[in-house]
Amino acid sequence: MTDTDKTKAASSMWGGRFAGGPAAIMQRINASIDFDKRLYAQDIRGSKAHCRMLVKQQILTEADGALILDGLDKVLAEIEAGNFPFSHALEDIHMNVESRLAELIGEAAGRLHTARSRNDQVATDFRLWVRDAVDGMESALKELVTALLDRAEEHAATVMPGFTHLQTAQPVTFGHHMMAYVEMISRDRSRLADARRRLNECPLGSAALAGTSFPIDREATARDLGFAGPMRNSLDGVSDRDFALEFMSASAICAVHLSRLAEELVIWTSSQFRFVTLSDAFTTGSSIMPQKRNPDAAELIRAKTGRVIGDLNALLIVMKGLPLAYSKDMQDDKEPVFEVADTMELAIAAMTGMVRDMTVNVDILRAAAGAGFTTATDIADWCVRALKMPFRRAHHVAGSLVKLAEGKNCGLEDLTLAEMQAIEPGITEEARSVLSVESSVNSRTSLGGTAPVRVREAVAGARRRLMDEAP
């Protein structure tokens, strides 16, 4: 079939009231096949479910139904073999599939669209695609959580500096730091699961907007396609893309979490920190400076977060002014969703690889944990417990000790007892026991705290939750 023939074929699907064909520029702006061909598997799956329902309801004959199902299998095989003749003249994946089906089986192909519009067809395809994307992303995030848990368990007692304002604050453990991201990514997975429950309703049978006069069985097609049930309102079924927005929103929040971890990896791998070393598999060199090991994977994850957020904003702006029901604006819903899914797939896989393969430089972390008077809060807490001092006064005492040590260019643990007692006479030699970074982290035994015993409990709890998930 020539392009001219295909243009005529496309027009024949909707052009009965037109005297002429579309302009060339109209064909270009109207065609979506370059991107929506990614929906081919979902489109064919939806068409097969629709066909089976039409046969069951005696709207199609069994003979026509068998022809259509066999023809759709052949179309699917051609696409997956790379032999399918995609055509811009046929506008979109739906018309491309239907046109090829007609070439293969003849007039029966035209009966497939009974009781169906491209409006509910594409809404169904898109929900199926997003559902698959959610499942794939959720599975990838589970692998990332597992990688983080492995490193957290390995380094439950590895001391490192904790930061606020990127200034050393209090000692924590590397395992505790990894578990913070386990919690964040676990919430990302929960958001995706929530989004999946809401998107798992079937719009097929909504037709153009008002439903159909044919005696269809929407429950049957919903079950066939694995949906929880049909959407309750036909206008809503073809009009909204909140399921796509929710997927993108959950992805954007997850991307922010990945970006924050990526930023920390960039900082931690710098020559000024050297907290971790990324494997050669996730770094690159310089074309001029032979010594360089650049954390490019982490930097690219950080950059790609902006693309995910931008795509979410783009679709929000597309949808914000659309009256019910379908508008052609909604053809532009797919590219941002596809890009978000592709970007997240790459970012999650790269982050999982970096976390699994990175070397944690334990000695450097330990040395850095004690710098910057990170146990100052511990001496204040000791004053509260041992001297029954109000915390605000204890805070002032600890601050004065820090000022003294800073002036002497030494650590808190290097101050003599006499020097400490000059600031607070009640301080005894026992106070020194709280000044080591190991003592500091071991004392943080409150629920969710950084004590190694709590970190190990948190790891075990997270692993149990993963095991308890439904398959």
Curated annotation (Swiss-Prot):
<dbReference type="InterPro" id="IPR000362">
    <property type="entry name" value="Fumarate_lyase_fam"/>
</dbReference>
<dbReference type="Pfam" id="PF00206">
    <property type="entry name" value="Lyase_1"/>
</dbReference>
<dbReference type="InterPro" id="IPR024083">
    <property type="entry name" value="Fumarase/histidase_N"/>
</dbReference>
<comment type="pathway">
    <text>Amino-acid biosynthesis; L-arginine biosynthesis; L-arginine from L-ornithine and carbamoyl phosphate: step 3/3.</text>
</comment>
<dbReference type="GO" id="GO:0004056">
    <property type="term" value="F:argininosuccinate lyase activity"/>
</dbReference>
<keyword id="KW-0028">Amino-acid biosynthesis</keyword>
<keyword id="KW-0456">Lyase</keyword>
<dbReference type="InterPro" id="IPR029419">
    <property type="entry name" value="Arg_succ_lyase_C"/>
</dbReference>
<dbReference type="InterPro" id="IPR020557">
    <property type="entry name" value="Fumarate_lyase_CS"/>
</dbReference>
<dbReference type="GO" id="GO:0042450">
    <property type="term" value="P:arginine biosynthetic process via ornithine"/>
</dbReference>
<comment type="similarity">
    <text>Belongs to the lyase 1 family. Argininosuccinate lyase subfamily.</text>
</comment>
<keyword id="KW-0963">Cytoplasm</keyword>
<dbReference type="InterPro" id="IPR009049">
    <property type="entry name" value="Argininosuccinate_lyase"/>
</dbReference>
<dbReference type="GO" id="GO:0005829">
    <property type="term" value="C:cytosol"/>
</dbReference>
<protein>
    <recommendedName>
        <fullName>Argininosuccinate lyase</fullName>
        <ecNumber>4.3.2.1</ecNumber>
    </recommendedName>
</protein>
<dbReference type="GO" id="GO:0006526">
    <property type="term" value="P:L-arginine biosynthetic process"/>
</dbReference>
<keyword id="KW-0055">Arginine biosynthesis</keyword>
<dbReference type="InterPro" id="IPR022761">
    <property type="entry name" value="Fumarate_lyase_N"/>
</dbReference>
<dbReference type="InterPro" id="IPR008948">
    <property type="entry name" value="L-Aspartase-like"/>
</dbReference>
<dbReference type="Pfam" id="PF14698">
    <property type="entry name" value="ASL_C2"/>
</dbReference>
